[in-house]
């Protein structure tokens, strides 16, 4: 492999934002060591033209794959087999890397050989403010930066419940050795990127670098609650794909520590689907028959694979009323008055958290 890092950039109708994304990568100190792989997923705007213009300017650092639309997972599947980097990372085309952090990251990768590398990332809001995400608990950062850890040793201490796509970099050969592929034709498959390789990875390194800049300002993103409400079918399909992967994996190859972590991860994923139905989507879009159907599937999965127990408490951690238990007893969501009260408490607790906890840092 002739590059240190391949960066897969799934692109669909991102003509206006793709230049910012690419400009953040093609900087002195990183340029010669990266491969920016723009995968044009059947864009109907000028995204392909933009990508090709960068390829002409930076032929040694930019590659372009043009393909029919197949949704997010298909872009990963198209890029992974031909990636030249020792390591590989995904960068959505409406997001970007902090350029100075990228150079530092590349310098660190020169002396790293672990299957996973974890960095910080920032969520960038519409007003330009940023919130950095680190793998810490109540302000404690339990891992020594730059040190190689056995992944089981990290998972055993319980600090980490899941990994997020924005913070993950994988060793490319590890993904190829496990035959990694993402589901095509549906959204939210970045969940697979942060889940499946954890079954296989042996070791991990944490770096004190705020690399990925996650753009939360753009309208229409798939994580917007209103968009999720309209895409419940795809959220459900993605959950079923996760369960299919679990059922087909040789679990006997996993240590008890790894298996316990994976089971807890899956429990949290099922809880997230319940949360979408019972807490997130607007009441006028809620269909009780759909909830009954998915409840039967998830209950069966919990019994079959030993997931759970699943409890669904409000995010504010003040009101301790289990929405899933209420559903099983009443076959309905919380009363309207309680949902409104819960929302009020959520707002108050968020305000207090920002005013007190964050300002004390």
Give the residues covered by each predicted segment.
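Short, well-formed alpha-helical segments that are part of the catalytic scaffolds
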Residues: 14-27
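Cell-envelope/extracellular polymer assembly enzymes that use nucleotide-activated donors
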Residues: 3-6, 35, 192
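Glycine-rich, basic loop-to-helix element that forms the pyrophosphate-binding segment
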Residues: 67-83
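Short beta-strand/loop segment that forms part of the nucleotide-sugar
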Residues: 33-42, 63-68, 93
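Membrane-interface aromatic/basic loop that binds lipid-linked glycans or pyrophosphate carriers
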Residues: 278-361
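A conserved acidic beta->alpha catalytic loop
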Residues: 24, 40-49, 68-70
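Short aromatic/hydrophobic "clamp" motif used to bind/position activated sugar donors
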Residues: 88
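Donor-binding/catalytic cores of nucleotide-activated saccharide
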Residues: 72, 76, 93-207, 212-230
